[in-house]
């Protein structure tokens, strides 16, 4: 399993994402922290920041932006993906500062992408829901879905492949076409339980078990 960071480092990243967004919404400036954990400067993993609005016991997507193959280093990728999630996701209006107490932050650290160069009919065996995220590319089209999306939606492997194709604005069966490139990756995911409260590491396989009950 891909787990490059400790829980303490994950907490730092989630709190960083929140504090950067708060500063940006308050002052319109991007604040770079002093003396961050050294590994976050030395590493350069893909990073996505997800922001969700708390709706009772449910969570509604508020924004999600990231860098599949990194940006400068993990620290900078977290900072700029957080700003993107709050204010640059084209699906949503920019966040307002007063929303901060009603949203949770989640930071996903992505492993390097691995191209599946095999018979597409074998993808149903090679792709594992609860472990893998997907990237689909064909020509100018591309789409990415994080591994937690398939778990949250209780998708089968085939449904996951179909939805990733659709995310790329391609036919749902694009994964069966050899012109389509399919990449898998893993993610280490850190998340707030409640707005600005405890940060934990998600166990997607444990969450997936609830889909099967």
Curated annotation (Swiss-Prot):
Recorded superkingdom: Archaea
InterPro entries: AMMECR1, AMMECR1_dom_sf, AMMECR1_domain, AMMECR1_N, AmmeMemoSam_A, Uncharacterised_MJ0810
UniProt xrefs under PROSITE patterns: AMMECR1
Signal peptide from the UniProt entry: none
Domain AMMECR1: 8-201
Gene3D superfamilies the record matches: Hypothetical protein ph0010, domain 1 (3.30.700.20), Hypothetical protein ph0010, domain 2 (3.30.1490.150)
UniProt cross-references to NCBIfam families, sorted A to Z: AmmeMemoSam_A, TIGR00296 family protein
Name of this chain's protein: Protein Pars_0011
Species per Swiss-Prot/TrEMBL record: Pyrobaculum arsenaticum (strain DSM 13514 / JCM 11321 / PZ6)
């Amino acid at each position: 399993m891909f787990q490059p960071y400790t829980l303490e480092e994950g907490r730092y990243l989630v709190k960083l994402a929140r504090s950067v967004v708060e500063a940006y919404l308050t002052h319109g400036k991007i604040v770079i922290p002093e003396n961050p954990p050294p590994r976050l400067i030395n590493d350069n993993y893909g990073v996505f920041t997800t922001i969700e609005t708390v709706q009772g016991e449910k969570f509604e997507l508020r924004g999600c932006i990231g860098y599949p193959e990194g940006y400068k280093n993990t620290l900078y990728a977290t900072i700029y993906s957080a700003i993107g999630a709050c204010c640059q996701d084209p699906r949503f209006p920019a966040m307002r500062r007063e929303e901060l107490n009603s949203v949770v932050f989640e930071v996903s650290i992505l492993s390097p992408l691995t191209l599946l160069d095999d018979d597409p009919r074998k993808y149903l065996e090679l792709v594992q829901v609860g472990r893998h995220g997907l990237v689909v590319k064909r020509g100018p089209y591309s789409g990415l879905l994080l591994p937690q999306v398939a778990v949250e939606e209780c998708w089968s492997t085939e449904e996951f492949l179909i939805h990733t194709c659709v995310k790329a604005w391609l036919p749902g069966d694009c994964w069966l076409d050899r012109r389509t490139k399919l990449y898998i990756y893993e993610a280490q995911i850190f998340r707030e339980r409640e707005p600005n409260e405890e940060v934990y590491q998600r166990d997607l396989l444990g969450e997936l078990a609830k889909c099967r009950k």
